[in-house]
From Swiss-Prot:
NCBIfam families: metG (TIGR00398). GO terms for biological process: methionyl-tRNA aminoacylation. The gene is metG. This is Methionine--tRNA ligase. It catalyses: tRNA(Met) + L-methionine + ATP = L-methionyl-tRNA(Met) + AMP + diphosphate. Monomer. It is found in: Cytoplasm. Its main location: cytoplasm. Belongs to the class-I aminoacyl-tRNA synthetase family. MetG type 2B subfamily.
């Protein structure tokens, strides 16, 4: 039986258009899904739209739209965006779905019956923009006003009746959870302990009475379930949890091998403290990994409209193509820290990696084959040191790639792919096949190894550039690149190489 993996992105807030940070998160999850697929896993990948909250209601009012019409429109825009980005998924979550709302309501009442959720009064600070309650100790104070510590949005003081989730019932358990190797970043774990656990965990307000758009706890109640108890449970309702047909939930969560959430560092508190506690309260299995990544910044710092440095991903896709953008975001940015983006860096990475290294290797190899042979090139054993070394590099390449990918270090994984290309180009320089003739067996030995090296690189690149890799596979005489053929150096023995159209053209800024 195949192993399974369930991979999720956060569901994005539809009060505005998707930006570069959204495609960054989703691309990490999508690449991980593609990688796991070629490793033989059965995968389920979800993204979506977080459609409740006061901010959504206000935005719809501002546009003179019914709130449901507004979120329908935004969800369609999100779906169109992922099509443009050529990012496919198995499920698009919408928290306004009837099934999701029913299950969340049931969960609320189940936890209320268990006295994990209780009624009290909330007095404190609230950010409408971030849909988040904060204490005065968590907020930034300036000129007698309070501001959100991450977004800098001004906080309002509110006092209202609210239902609370008793987080403190789970304080000892969550400390143990944070010490497990589930959260990808140790720095984030230390930050969560320092800022929240060690200061004492405040019980969480999970309903509001002055909220115009959300899930009512029942038809007659003034209480509306507040964002995180609603939004986080879509990770389960996507799979049919709590519904009549729970087969996907059974397969990918309850009995699944891997359950992976990809999240930006700004929402780790909700995913690494609240979400595990919510699951524990229902005796549901934990995620096996929560991948927390940094932000995308520009050379001038964080993107903001006031700085005029906000990058529109749609413009980038139209200008460079979705695969070039996705390659840069996964191959040149580390999930462990904030990543710097600029068009200059994108173009430089593309030209250096894909044009100078990979495309140049293909064109040098194919040109020498076409100049010398009108037949397939067979794999011939060689005892020459340079041939044995390059064979070893090619055979070890995917193993090296996997050693990084298993740690979610895709930047290092793809760096190892490009390094193989550099070694193959150096192999050409060392063996100088242009001085050999077709009567010389050494020429066939070299060119066959170069073809096998190109195959290995293209196979790895197919994880982030499937369309371009597919074109190259066809040009080389294969239906697709396959893991099972990586170490079979005789795969080109019956393939006559034809002229290959250039797949990577140099970009000038």
């Amino acid at each position: 039986m195949k192993k399974t993996i369930y991979i999720t992105t956060p569901i994005y807030y539809p009060s505005g258009d998707l930006h570069l940070g959204h495609i960054y998160s989703t691309n990490i999850a999508w690449v991980l899904r593609n990688y796991k697929k070629i490793q033989g896993y059965e995968t389920f990948f979800s993204t979506g739209s977080d459609e409740h909250g006061q901010k959504i209601f206000n935005k719809a009012q501002e546009l003179k739209l019914e709130t449901q019409d507004y979120v329908d429109r935004q969800a369609n825009k999100f779906i169109d965006f992922w099509k443009k980005a050529n990012i496919d998924y198995d499920f698009f979550a919408r928290t306004t779905n009837k099934e999701h709302k029913e299950v969340v309501r049931e969960i609320f009442h189940k936890l209320k019956e268990k006295n994990i959720i209780y009624l009290d009064k909330y007095v404190g600070l609230y950010s409408v923009s971030d849909e988040e309650f904060l204490t005065e100790t968590q907020a930034l104070k300036k000129d007698n006003k309070f501001f959100h510590p991450v977004s800098n949005h001004e906080l309002i003081k509110i006092e209202e009746e609210s239902y609370f989730f008793n987080l403190n019932l789970f304080i000892d358990w969550i400390k143990e959870f944070l010490d497990q190797d589930i959260i990808s970043s140790k720095a984030i774990v230390n930050e969560l302990k320092s800022n929240f656990i060690n200061k004492g965990l405040e019980n969480l307000s999970v309903t509001r009475i002055k909220l115009d758009w959300g899930i009512k706890i029942d038809q007659s109640s003034k209480h509306v379930i507040y964002v995180w108890l609603d939004a986080l449970f879509q990770y389960l309702t996507n799979l049919g949890y709590g519904s009549k047909n729970q087969s996907l939930y059974e397969k990918f969560w309850k009995n699944g091998d891997e359950r992976v959430h990809v999240v930006g560092k700004e929402i780790t508190r909700f995913h690494c403290i609240y979400w595990p506690i919510f699951l524990k309260s229902l005796n549901v299995k934990m995620p096996t990994k929560i991948i927390s990544h940094g932000w995308i910044v520009t050379p001038e710092g964080k993107m903001s409209k006031s700085k005029g440095n906000v990058v529109d991903p749609v413009v980038l896709i139209e200008k460079y193509g979705s695969e070039v953008l996705k390659y840069f975001l996964i191959a040149k940015l580390s999930i462990k820290k904030d990543g710097v983006f600029s068009e200059e860096l994108l173009v430089s990475a593309y030209n250096n990696d894909l044009v100078n290294t990979f495309s140049n290797l293909i064109s040098r190899t194919v040109k020498m084959i076409l100049n010398n042979y009108d037949r397939p090139l067979s794999f011939i054993l060689s005892k020459d040191q340079e041939d044995l070394e390059i064979e070893k590099d090619i055979k070890n390449s995917f193993e090296t790639f996997c050693s990084f990918a298993e740690e979610y270090e895709f930047d290092k994984a793809f760096e190892s792919t490009i390094n193989l290309g550099k070694k193959l180009n150096l192999y050409i320089d060392k063996t100088r096949p242009w001085l050999l003739t077709k009567e010389d067996q050494k020429l066939e030995i070299v060119l066959n190894r170069l073809l096998n090296g190109i195959y290995a690189m293209a196979f790895e690149l197919s994880i982030v550039m499937p369309q371009t890799s597919q074109k190259l596979a066809k040009a080389l005489g294969f239906e697709s690149f396959e893991k099972s053929k990586l170490e079979d150096f005789k795969k080109f023995d019956n393939i006559k190489i034809e002229k290959i159209e250039n797949l990577f053209n140099r970009i000038k800024l």
